[in-house]
Amino acid sequence: YGGLPINLKEKVRLFRRHLYQLAKDKKPLFKTQTAIAHPESKIELKQAMSACEHIGQTQDNKQIYLYRHQGSSPIMREIGRLREIAFRAVGEGSGNRRDVDPYDRYYEHLILWDVEDLEIVGAYRLGNTSQMLEAEQALYTQSLFNYTEQMTPYFDNGLELGRSFVQPKYWGKRSLDYLWYGIGAYLNKHPKIRYLFGPVTLSNSMPKAAKDLLVYFYKLHFSAAGTNLVSSKMPYHLPQDFNDVAEFKITGVDYKSDFMTLKNLLANM
């Protein structure tokens, strides 16, 4: 809508017509997203959080809980709602009222809780891979990667991380750091875990050149090639001439130097 090559008056006319179409339950003129679900009751959330395992507290009195899904829970519904808000804010999101998937039912959820405003600040989804595979539960990352049997020692002592978010009103307030405090507390309770792994999403709003640089950098310094552990089901393909151009700037000789170069290149995009 915003990019239509027409004047403001014409845009207003089309937008008014779009709203009339919606009101009459007819096909809208513009593609729209599903409305995000209404917030859960704060009283019900507080009651449900009190039944979760408490594993930590931050200096500013945020509480860290571990939630295991059971039945129809306001916690899981609110996590799904806030995920959708956070991901839509960066041009992503499922397009649904809540962002939930089948894995949520048997993964654990690390939650940062604001006791004053009675709100979920953010969350991380955790998968204790040894326990999950013993129970024959599929890992989320198995939908993205092909693992070989040589990954077994890592699964036996591993924790899959993913689906992290912080709701926008708490951005810039150390919320992600606090979630990592919670991960540290979880690891302290499970000393067998030695390996953390999981997928990272690059937003489609990021310029392609920036994504190319990030993929090139991490393939250069942390490639899984030759390890015979894992391969991507949908590998990212760099432009044919990208290596020839990038290797003059990011050499692969010194990680710290290459990382500073990467940051400078990204800052100028």
Where are these regions (language model features)?
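Non-catalytic C-terminal accessory region of glycerolipid acyltransferases
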Residues: 1-37, 244-252, 266
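Short catalytic/ligand-binding loop motif for oxyanion handling, primarily in non-cytosolic enzymes
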Residues: 2, 120, 204-208
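Short alpha-helical functional segments enriched in proximate histidine and acidic residues
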Residues: 22, 86-89, 186-190
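Conserved N-terminal entry element of GNAT/NAT acetyltransferase domains
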Residues: 33-70
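Short amphipathic alpha-helix that is part of the acyltransferase structural core
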Residues: 56-109
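Beta-sheet entry/capping signal
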Residues: 79, 109, 119, 193-197
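Acyl-donor binding region in acyl/amide transferases
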Residues: 94, 130-269
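Conserved beta-strand in the GNAT
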Residues: 111, 119-127
